[in-house]
Every structure is written in C-alpha cells, then in structure tokens.
C-alpha cells in the first residue's frame, strides 16, 4: 500500500485526505469532468480521477464500460468533448498523441502491437525514438554523436530488458517469443519512452496463472524501480485486488465507485452492477 489514503464522496471524486508526512504529495495525472460522445451518445461521462505520483491504480468494469476509451482520451487518441486532463499540472488540451507521450504518458494495448519482424531490442529502441538527441544530418552522415547516442540507447535498452530477464533474447525476432514474453516486451517498449504514468490495458490477458503472478511482481518492480505511477485496466480481479492501491469502477461510461481494494470488494453497487450479484448476496468482489 502507498503511504497515503484515498477517500471519495459522491460530489468530489478528486478529494484526498493525506497524513501530515504527505503534505508534499502531488498528482501525476488529473482527469477533470472528462466526457466524450460518439453519435450523440456518451461513451465516457464526467470522468474524474486523480492518480498519485507512484500510485498503482486500477480501472475496472464490464466489457463496453468505456475503460479503453478513457485510455484513448488520456493519450489523445480521442479528443474529449468536455473536461480536461492535467499531466504534472500541465493541461494537455491541444496536444497530439506524440506530445502527450513526450509529456510522460505511455501505454500498452489490449492486442499486442509489436513490430514482430524486428528484433526484441529494436522494438525497445523504437520506444526511445522520441528521446534521441541527434539531428538528421548527424544520423545521415553517421557522425560520432550519432554512434555515441546509439550506444547509449542500446545499453539502456538492454538494462530495461534485464529487469524482465529478457536480455538474452535481445536479438531474437519479437514474433518468435511466447505470448507472455511478447506482453512483457510491450511493457518494456513503453518504459523506454521514460514515462511518469504507465497505462496498461489488460496486461494479463491470455496469461496463465504463473505468468500472471510474475506480472504482478514485475508491476511492483516497475513502480519501485522507476518511481512512476501505473494505471491498469484488468478483468483478473485477483491481480487488481492484489496490487492496486486505489480502484475506480466504470459502468456505462460513468464511475460508480472508487476506493481501496477492500472498499471495492465489499461495495454493494460494484457487486450488483459489475459482478451481476444482488446486494443481498454475500459473495464479495474478490471471490468472483
């Protein structure tokens, strides 16, 4: 658990009560009144959420609830109809997807999007493209600055791969990796952009229990090593309840509950709306 506690009410979903030692706390991301409509119908409606600088936050809800749409809004794949997004206090209005990435937001996708014909390390190096420090002339003429930057980038890529135990697969073709390893590689590539906030869209999809357990350990390792915030969409409740410090529940584009894992697993609104259980039934969210 993080050193601060989140509390919420029905009117201000961004309210926080912090211990005295956390007075210096600042959020890395704030979504305020975020809404988007498609064909006049709301896909996300008045979405309010604050993610702390090193928080692991879960976004859960049934299929079609709008979770991936939220990620698309945060990364500017979609522009919101209303509301705003702050990254480190900076309004992202008018930013492109690339600019938001440079501002510190990286993501993975439900469906793996690797360059499968390229090597593992080349996939990671592509993630570093926005942060290379040489111009076209330097690159074209292969000047010393180019080789110095390329060497530094490769060393950094190998360092990132080693966190996931993938350094020995650096020269392997990405498409030849097992499914779980491809998932890990996609996370490494996102980390290569140097994010402050990492968005993981169903990172455990298709993984077996052993791979899921390893993923949980790796998510903690990423947060602790890089001191970044992680926000994840996931249907595996054991994973969500096991690693998230704060959870928001989305249904029909609206947040219906927020709180700690313990609060969410006991919340009758979540049990009824998300898990399909009547309020009188005793089974909690984690038991699904």
Feature roles, as predicted:
Residues 2-288:
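Glycine-rich phosphate-binding loops of nucleotide-dependent enzymes
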């Amino acid at each position: 658990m993080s050193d601060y506690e989140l509390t919420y009410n029905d009117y201000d979903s961004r309210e926080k009560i912090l211990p005295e030692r956390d007075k210096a706390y600042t959020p890395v991301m704030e979504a305020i009144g975020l809404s988007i409509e498609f064909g006049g119908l709301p896909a996300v409606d008045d979405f309010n959420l604050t993610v702390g600088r090193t928080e692991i936050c879960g976004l859960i809800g049934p299929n079609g609830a709008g979770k991936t749409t939220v990620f698309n809004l945060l990364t500017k794949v979609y522009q919101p109809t209303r509301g705003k997004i702050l990254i480190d206090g900076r309004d992202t209005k008018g930013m492109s997807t690339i600019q938001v990435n440079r501002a510190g937001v990286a993501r993975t996708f439900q469906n793996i999007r690797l360059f499968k014909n390229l090597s593992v390390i080349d996939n990671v190096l592509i993630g570093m493209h926005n942060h290379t420090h040489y111009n076209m002339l330097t690159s074209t003429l292969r000047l010393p600055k180019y080789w110095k930057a390329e060497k530094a980038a490769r060393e950094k890529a190998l360092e990132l791969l080693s966190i996931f135990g993938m350094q020995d697969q650096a020269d392997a073709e990405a498409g030849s990796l097992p499914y779980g390893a491809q998932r890990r590689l996609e996370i490494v590539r996102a980390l290569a952009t140097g994010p402050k906030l990492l968005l993981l869209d169903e990172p455990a999809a298709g993984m077996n229990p052993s791979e899921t357990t390893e993923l949980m350990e790796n998510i903690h390792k990423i947060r602790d090593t890089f001191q970044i915030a992680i926000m994840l969409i996931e249907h595996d409740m054991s994973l969500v309840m096991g690693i998230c410090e704060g959870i928001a529940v989305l249904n029909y584009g609206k947040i219906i509950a927020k709180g700690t894992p313990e609060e969410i697993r006991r919340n009758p609104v979540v049990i009824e709306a998300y898990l399909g259980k009547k309020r009188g039934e005793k089974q909690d969210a984690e038991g699904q």
